[in-house]
Curated annotation (Swiss-Prot):
GO molecular function: aspartate-tRNA ligase activity; aspartate-tRNA(Asn) ligase activity; ATP binding; nucleic acid binding
The protein's name in its UniProt record: Aspartate--tRNA(Asp/Asn) ligase
Gene responsible for this protein: aspS
Alphabetical list of Pfam families matching this protein: GAD, tRNA-synt_2, tRNA_anti-codon
Assembly and binders: Homodimer.
UniProt catalytic activity: tRNA(Asx) + L-aspartate + ATP = L-aspartyl-tRNA(Asx) + AMP + diphosphate
Residues the entry annotates as binding L-aspartate: 173, 219, 447, 484
Compartment list: Cytoplasm
GO BP, one annotated term: aspartyl-tRNA aminoacylation
Species annotation: Campylobacter jejuni subsp. jejuni serotype O:23/36 (strain 81-176)
Family membership: Belongs to the class-II aminoacyl-tRNA synthetase family. Type 1 subfamily.
Function: Aspartyl-tRNA synthetase with relaxed tRNA specificity since it is able to aspartylate not only its cognate tRNA(Asp) but also tRNA(Asn). Reaction proceeds in two steps: L-aspartate is first activated by ATP to form Asp-AMP and then transferred to the acceptor end of tRNA(Asp/Asn).
Amino acid sequence: MRSHYNTDLGISHVGQSVKLCGWVNSYRDHGGVIFIDLRDRSGIIQLVCDPNDSKEAHEIASNARNEFVLIAEGAIRPRGEGLVNPKLKTGEIEVVVSKLTIENESAVPPFTIADESVNEELRLKYRFLDLRNPKLYENFALRSKACIAARNSLANMGFLEVETPILTKATPEGARDYLVPSRVHQGEFYALPQSPQLFKQLLMCSGFDRYFQIAKCFRDEDLRADRQPEFTQIDVEMSFCEQKDVINVAETFLKDIFKACGKEIQTPFRQMQYKDAMENYGSDKPDLRFDLKFIDVIDIFAKSNNEIFANIAKDTKKNRIKAIRVPKGDTIFSKRQMQRFEEFVRKFGAQGLAFIQVKEDGLKGPLCKFFSEEDLNELSKRCELEVGDVVFFGAGAKKTVLDYMGRFRIFLANELNLIDPNALEFLWVVDFPMFEQNDDGSYSAMHHPFTMPKNIDETDLEEISSIAYDVVLNGVELGGGSIRIHKNDIQQKVFKLLNIDEEQQKEKFGFLLDALSFGAPPHGGIAIGLDRLIMLVTGANSIREVIAFPKTQRAQCLMTDAPSPASNEAMRELGIKLRENIK
């Protein structure tokens, strides 16, 4: 029907006849000549409807309004002197309309498509209108390129695309399952998959060797800016591999994805052990676009005559004292800013925020009186302090200190404008602990219970490490993976350490244990969050901007009003009766 998309046209097309299709973005009547900004998925082009060129087209144009659907035919001409619009890709040209058709009319839209100040809830309610914005379209064009690049890259490396079931069995993977009642087997439920984890392992047991899938996954968890109840991941599994093989494959397809999106990235990515990431940056996904690395000073504080710090420093296993040096910070930060810094860390469990300033005549601050001159010199040397610097200290329980100092590090970087928004800093975090302790004292798998442990015979669960790895970009976890357990006895031992008894093992994972009993090969894999990846590539503020029809932070679709009550008839067929006053 059309000859071109709007932004395919430029000054080189002057004199050509074209046929364009799209929506009225805006409409202006200037002394009898009507100007229409016609919008299609690519962008905007200006139509000129002059009665001297076509009375019929001009008359039809006079009835057009915002969001009417038009088909326009005419000739390209350059805009007049001083009328070029540099904000538009087509800003040097316009279309002199000879024929115009109103293909469909529109009700008055609830908002202007290009208005970025519109409330997000209103945009989501009328998402079909919101998606007419060419800026949003660009996100999905990029997403499509990324998916095509991922498929081509993995296929070139010998991976086979296989779809795994959506209706499956509930298995504990760290979040709540979405359950689907069975009409045929009343009282029983399917679960929507949190990931294809077990099925892709079964494919390795089946000898498929290399699998991938762009998989839809579901998790019933609290939502944040980078989470949705349904999300998409690039899921990969391979047999007869080590960690380095999976990392090489992931770097290859990530490089191809970024190239397709117009960005060049360097491989291999740097690697960092989990314990180093936590001890030096207070995060298992550190943002390395800036420095502000922690400095361990617990041994120096052990020599202070401040009873609080000295007591903290006695237990180097459970406690931490970390410093962050800010070069020239003493010349930058006001007294009010220093107060804000303390208010910030207190929100995350800090008792306060001690600091020392470096003046021309030496170190200054309330802390200094608790140290000998020798200890202050040692502190200055370790922190590499210079005149004008300020150094902040966090002290207390290990988990609390690393958490609030890690958050404070990012807070400082934003305050100091240290973060380059165009930088792409990739990192592999490796050697994760196998288990982590919950608030109630029990243990759970840090990644999942199918990860291969390195030292399974270690008696202290917190000392057992795993062959697990996360890929991080600019402080955001893009995805993670591991080498899997491929031996039945090791898998059962891990289940036992997690207090999953033999009966539960058989009930929940019997099919996996069976598969591991029939010659399962060594295997491992990775999953990359596609939504997060595209969010970072496009610079979007939320994954809602890169998902066509997203849910709100209350897991609702405002456009379709989902979730919604089921009819009584449907509930009877499923054999389900809700409790009264369930809300």
